[in-house]
Amino acid sequence: MMYKAVFSDFNGTLLTSQHTISPRTVVVIKRLTANGIPFVPISARSPLGILPYWKQLETNNVLVAFSGALILNQNLEPIYSVQIEPKDILEINTVLAEHPLLGVNYYTNNDCHARDVENKWVIYERSVTKIEIHPFDEVATRSPHKIQIIGEAEEIIEIEVLLKEKFPHLSICRSHANFLEVMHKSATKGSAVRFLEDYFGVQTNEVIAFGDNFNDLDMLEHVGLGVAMGNAPNEIKQAANVVTATNNEDGLALILEEKFPE
């Protein structure tokens, strides 16, 4: 099979545990780009959290933020955007008020506001993504692209079940044991890939996607070759076509070198 586009999750997939891209991975991605194969980062992060790596890879292509809620072209202009309705935000905030220990971040374009900027989980998120997180602002958070909820794994599972029950019309998915993402129903990685297949003029069976967690599932199931990382949960591995090495063992580069030999 001749593959014509590649999509990759970020944390736990493209990035090592040290939040870097390995030299081997950089080399193979730059080779793909030089040969006209789009390599698209598709992340739960905001555009600002993706951009340093996007520039490092020199892909000069689109990027997908907020797990599909926002897609920017090579000029960093939006070509797709879906946001949570204000009425849903009000109701979600009421539910989350009963869980004061959780970190809650509201992302809109490149802005992030936190329910409590001193929350330990919010401080951790700021240390990883290096983005500025502002104090809560009712106007700025009335219709975000994404709500990020961070906490202990047990409480994250509890709040996931609760929110899915109350808001079946929203996209609610864990991106990590400690992270829950809430977005518009049309904001999934699978939906973003479908949109970009049309954008690039490629067929589904000509697409490879890499992922390591539950918010990657619909993307991995959709594409021609869904690749789960060796560090992915068993449910993700079972849903993928192929399981590669971990993100710390150049798992992504191994598959790309195999499918796109020099």
Curated annotation (Swiss-Prot):
**Catalytic residues (UniProt):** 9 (nucleophile)
Q: Which Pfam families match?
A: Hydrolase_3
Record-listed phosphate binding positions: 43-44, 189, 215
Q: Which residues bind Mg(2+)?
A: 9, 11, 212
List GO molecular-function terms, semicolon-separated. Answer: magnesium ion binding; phosphatase activity
**GO cellular component, as recorded:** cytosol
Matches recorded under SUPFAM superfamilies: HAD-like
Names of the cofactor(s): Mg(2+)
| Keyword annotations of the record | Hydrolase, Magnesium, Metal-binding
Please state the Enzyme Commission number of this protein: 3.1.3.-
Instruction: State the name under which the record lists this protein.
Output: Putative phosphatase HI_0003
